[in-house]
């Protein structure tokens, strides 16, 4: 089975393998109210406090406390996603700073996770392994942590996991036995990733490998979510890739660059490509060669991509129900399923899980809205995200918002109740509403809410020497890399 990220880049559909009953979950008791000591950058309406807490609770409550593995999706039976583990490892310190868990509780959860991955078996065998060459399989059994059958060793998902590992390495900086061990194991996990091995077509980084078939015949190139992959690989103190890799990866940028809804930008379509790397790395004011030549930076670029998606929804060229300034946001997410029938008076094609988006390179839009698309961009474009979320909550909140925040997606144009849905249900007067929440979509909501409110995740990651080394080897200069304050 191809990895989800490779399928997303090709805008194909993902058919997940059979489900696994999730491990028993232990929910820790609620704690006394706490006033955050985080510096206030921007205030938000009270609803967003609740949303951030509920999204944190998703990671704290659904992760297997015995090994730290976070589910790919919940509440349905699920395997673990290593990318979701990376977001979870970042979520725990946010919980500390917001007073939702103690530092010791978070440190223990992190240490449990890191120890599991430190000791998990690595090898070439097709079963019974968690990873190989320092990389990890995209999906793991929630209980055993072993490879989910048929799944690939994933470069990008390993990188998203490692983003959480490096974040914890920098956050847990106290001189205690527990925090020293966190830093030591985090360094060990990162240092043993053999990044050059994952380059069957150097200097590009390949998408993945399986014991059965070897390397996937595609590499990451061009503007997408793989920025963080290349930066981590360039920054490795033990197995770095050649510095020419960034230039090779970005060589195809010209085909992604252009004017989309009145804004010059690198445009890929699904908003997750603009959000994943920037959930951790502060790109405000720092520039590589391409951005220097175009008098921009990746933060500004993501703002323009977000604003263009809103304008696309206002234009609503396909005539989907509800689209406009108060409802927009296309990204990779769940969908009702693969169906073709009449809706809104037109012949329509709907999809299951797919890389929805609108941009220069193409559009895939079936009327499905993912709350993570807008919320993951709140730090880029708060003036349009905040009122959109408030309007969406007022109109659809009773159906799409719950104990762990927003469901993954919903579709106001889909009302057929006589088909076998991939997940979720059709709610009268609302449309299709997913029943699942995905870790890789909950993560950007939590991290970017906190980055907008306090800059916390960005500030911690700016201290990580491997991230700085990777950025500098990629040719980034200016901004906080030169000691200047990061401004929005």
Language model features: what each stretch is:
Residues 1-9:
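Bacterial N-terminal signal peptides that target proteins for export
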Residues 9-19:
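Bacterial N-terminal signal peptides
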Residues 24-488:
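Ser/Thr/Asn(+Pro)-rich, low-complexity disordered segments
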Residues 3-4, 17, 24:
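N-terminal leader/targeting segments
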